[in-house]
Amino acid sequence: MDPCDCAKTGTCNCGATCKCTNCQCTTCKKSCCSCCPSGCSKCASGCVCKGNSCGSSCCQ
């Protein structure tokens, strides 16, 4: 069962075949999927980006 709960758009699969697309889920571990949008190169530890925006406090 997929433990992720992704918002409206995007897909998240935290199973054996981890895949994340435009994911906004909050339960997905960063080691599995980056929940930052594609425009963000790196997510800060424990950070979850919201929507399609990335704040400086979130991504580095």
UniProtKB/Swiss-Prot annotation:
MF GO annotations: metal ion binding
Region Beta: start and end of each range?
A: 1-28
- The residues that the entry says bind a divalent metal cation 5 are C33, C35, C36, C49
Q: What PROSITE patterns does this protein's entry cite?
A: METALLOTHIONEIN_VRT
Residues engaged in binding a divalent metal cation 1? C4, C6, C20, C23
| InterPro entries with a match to the protein in the record | Metalthion_dom_sf, Metalthion_dom_sf_vert, Metalthion_vert, Metalthion_vert_metal_BS
Name of the featured protein: Metallothionein-2
Recorded source organism is: Cyprinus carpio
Query: What phylogenetic lineage does the species belong to?
Result: Eukaryota, Metazoa, Chordata, Craniata, Vertebrata
Q: Which gene encodes it?
A: mt2
